[in-house]
Regions:
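Detector for C-terminal structural segments
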Residues: 19, 32, 202, 303-331, ...
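N-terminal lobe/hinge region of extracytoplasmic solute-binding protein
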Residues: 40-91, 122, 191-192
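Surface-exposed binding/hinge segments that line
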Residues: 97-99, 134-178, 200
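Alpha-helical secondary-structure segments
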Residues: 112-120, 148-154, 194-195, 223-225, ...
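Gly/Pro-rich hinge or "lid" segments in bacterial periplasmic/extracellular proteins
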Residues: 167-220, 225
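Ligand-site clamp/hinge motif
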Residues: 213-259
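Structural transition elements
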Residues: 320-355, 371-378
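Ligand/substrate-recognition segments at binding pockets and active sites
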Residues: 353-423
Length: 525
């Protein structure tokens, strides 16, 4: 996954670790005669409607819908996809114009023109789903369709990052004849214009993608069909890969399985390891009588042992994180370590007693059972152990499947809950802006006027993102002082595949979303 916001980062760097030696290669022919490439993941979509999703549904959207801009392999900035060209037409970065490719259609044959683009963007804001992508468009004033092929975006303030917003799957273009602007689309079919058509969809089970012959864009499809299978636990995911029921896994492999595959227990397996800006963190509900107390939040932040979580639960396949902005991005600091240092029961007790809290604090912690892999349950058991070992907390744990989990936190049902975040684009803005303000990715208002009214607008005037360190340093300090969000770890990205599958190294875009069209079978081995 999610609410989101803006701008720049290096493309995910991936290094392939081959577990097989002595192979001769290969050409990237069409592999339709061997059937679709089968991809397994624990990251199932929550919806098929782009206007309703700011989460990991985007992984599917990227492949079945189209956006004006997208990321070709190796790109660090968005490039035209449905658009032929896009640019700011003024010096203040407030008017952005795109010319569409000629002859665009949706997979159902309906015309995709400037009116459809305007309708799609306006629809997001009109429906305004809680936890949906409307929050990405806070700098947009209006959309204008000029003739059939020109779309002009008028912004209400300078925003050099707006092209990155248009490149997110949240801005997918939909067919006005198929998608009402009064409600979220129901059902298990779509009308898109991406590289693939969704031939069959079984929620929580599988998505069958076949080549969209009407697609016009930059993607050079290297296969004719992909089937994505959705798993509720990592064990079953890894077992099906070993049993050759899958060609590749994306998201959800447990740490033990990653290590096992890397140690070459499967002779015909490749593991691709990549850098990732994905993070996991705790969210505190300010309306809860206990989680709403600053002293309680600070005590939890003081007690969390991130190194133990990374090593004991995730076997060092993740890194401890002490800021909401991950390492490797402009402006990253260690604000939470600076505030709290190493875990300390004595310091945590002082936070509570100074606030007049002398009893054990009862807290309910919630996590999703089927989104981030089976290690999530172990992680929350470890957090429970750490907090209760201090003698300061009594913790109860609760888990729910993702679809109902999202509904719960958007309704404010959870005192404390875990979330993962996959960036919309690799910029510090995208790790601060989505979580603050009246409308955010968490469904829980977080007023932070110093950030939303001053620091973010200042940073968005700056096209050179190396010059925003000061603003995001201050923002991270505010987040640490509030302790409404407590970062836990930053992930690494692992793809495990059969040795006859290639393209994994090129398949991840800058937000670690898989571009299925890059995968193909080796035709000689």
């Amino acid at each position: 996954m999610f609410n989101r916001k803006r701008c720049l980062r290096p493309v995910v760097a991936v290094a392939s670790i081959s577990l097989v030696a002595g192979c001769s290669v290969l050409s990237d022919g069409n592999s339709a005669d061997k059937g679709p490439i089968i991809v397994g993941t624990t990251s199932a979509p929550s919806t098929l409607d782009p206007a309703a999703s700011w989460d990991q549904s985007w992984e599917l959207f990227r492949n079945i819908y189209q956006t004006l801009l997208n990321y070709p392999v190796g790109a660090t900035a968005p490039q035209p996809d449905a658009a032929k060209s896009c640019r700011f037409t003024d010096s203040s970065n407030t008017v952005y114009s795109c010319e569409l490719r000629a002859g665009l259609t949706f997979s159902n044959g309906h015309k995709l023109d400037a009116r459809a683009v305007k309708y799609s963007i306006d629809r997001i804001r009109k429906i305004d789903v809680n936890g949906g992508p409307a929050g990405l468009l806070d700098s947009l004033d209006s959309v204008q369709a000029v003739g059939d092929r020109q779309v002009v975006f008028h912004l209400n303030k300078p925003d050099a990052t707006f092209p990155f917003v248009l490149a997110t799957p949240g801005m997918s273009i939909v067919d006005p004849e198929e998608y009402s602007d009064k409600a979220v689309r129901k059902g298990d079919t779509i009308a898109g214009s991406g590289p693939y058509d969704l031939q069959n969809y079984q929620p929580g089970k599988q998505a069958v993608l076949v080549a969209n012959k009407r697609y016009k864009g930059f993607a050079d499809r290297r296969n004719d069909a992909v089937t994505i299978r959705y798993f509720q636990d990592s064990q079953a995911l890894a077992a099906d890969l070993r049993d050759k029921k899958l060609d590749l896994t994306f998201r959800g492999l447990a740490a033990d399985d990653v290590i096992s595959f890397q140690r070459n227990d499967s002779k015909d397996m490749d593991v691709t390891e990549g850098a990732s800006n994905e993070i996991e963190y705790l969210v505190f509900n300010p309306k809860d009588p206990w989680a709403g107390k600053l002293a309680v939040r600070k005590a939890v932040a003081q007690l969390i042992n991130r190194s133990a979580i990374a090593h004991d639960v995730y076997k060092d396949t993740v890194e401890p994180l002490y800021s909401m902005v991950p390492a490797g991005l402009t402006g990253h600091n260690t604000a939470y370590f600076d505030d709290f240092g190493d875990p300390s029961a004595a310091k945590a007790r002082r936070f509570l007693t100074d606030a007049g809290i002398t009893q054990k604090v009862p807290l309910a912690l919630w996590y999703t059972t089927d989104r981030y892999g089976s290690a999530t349950a172990k992680e929350f058991q470890e957090i429970k152990r750490q907090l209760e070992a201090s003698g300061l907390f009594t913790i109860t744990l609760h888990g729910r499947p993702w679809n109902t989990y999202v509904e719960g936190y958007e309704k404010g049902e959870y005192p404390v809950f875990g979330r993962g975040w996959s960036p919309d684009f690799p910029d510090p803005d995208n790790f601060v802006a989505p979580f603050v303000g009246k409308q955010n990715a968490l469904g829980t208002p977080y007023p932070a006027p110093e950030i939303t009214d001053k620091l973010l607008p200042q940073s968005r005037r700056e096209s050179d993102r190396a010059n925003v360190v000061k603003e995001f340093g201050q923002a991270q300090r505010i987040l640490a002082d509030d302790a409404r969000l407590v970062p836990l770890w930053q992930s690494k990205q692992y793809l495990a595949s059969r040795d006859d599958i290639s393209g994994a190294e090129q398949s991840l875009d800058p937000s670690s979303i898989m571009m299925m069209w890059e995968l193909y079978r080796k035709t000689s081995w």
